Amino acid sequence: WPLRMAADCEVRSNRCTAMTTSHGGIVMKAIQIDQTGGDEVLVYRDVPQPIPGVGEVLIRVEAAGVNFSDIMWRRGDYDIPTPVPFIPGAEVAGTVVAVGPGVTGFEIGTAVVSAPPSGGYAQFVVAPTAATFPIPKGISPIEVVSLMAQGLTGVLALRKSARLAPGETVLVEAAAGGVGSFAVQLAKL
C-alpha cells in the first residue's frame, strides 16, 4: 500500500492518538454535530481518524478558521441539507502527517494551509492536494489560516468581480469583518 505516514503517527504514539476503535482504526478528537441548531449541537467526541485517498493528504490540524459558512452548515441554513453527523471546518493550517496514493509534491512534515470540504474542527483532516498549499517559513499556522476563506474571498471580490485596477477608488462596506479587512489591505496594493 503506498500510503506514507509520519513515524510519530503510529497507533502506539500519543502524539497523534493513543486510542483505537473496536475495529482497529485510529481515533481522534473532533467537534461534531448530529443535528442542526445553535452552538449547543456542537459535541466534542472521539471519532475515527480519516485515511487519505488518492490525491489527498492527512493534516495534523494546528489552527482552524471559524467562518460564517461553518455556522450556516451547523444551523442548516444552506439550501441543501447538512449531512449529519458532520464535522465543520473548511479552513485549516497544520502539518502533513500522511499522503495518499499518487501524491507528489507534499512530504511528511510539510507545514501547509488548506481548504478541505469539511472536517477541520478535528485533530486531523484529509484534504485534497489541489486545495492545499505549503506555508512559507516564518509564518505561523494561526497567521495563515484565515487566508483561505476570507483572504481569497477578498481577492476574488476585488480582482474578479470588481476588476479593480491601479489608481481606482473602492468603497469596502463592512471593512471591520474578516473579508472586509483583507479587501481594504488588498485595495491599497
PLM regions: where:
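Glycine-rich beta-strand-centered segment in the early N-terminal region that forms part
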Residues: 48-66, 77-119
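Cytochrome P450 core scaffold surrounding the K-helix E-X-X-R motif
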Residues: 69-75
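A structural motif shared across PLP-dependent enzymes of the aminotransferase-like
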Residues: 116-129
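Residue-level detector of alpha-helix initiation sites
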Residues: 68, 139, 176-179
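Short pre-catalytic strand/loop immediately N-terminal to key active-site residues, enriched for Gly-Thr
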Residues: 84, 139-147
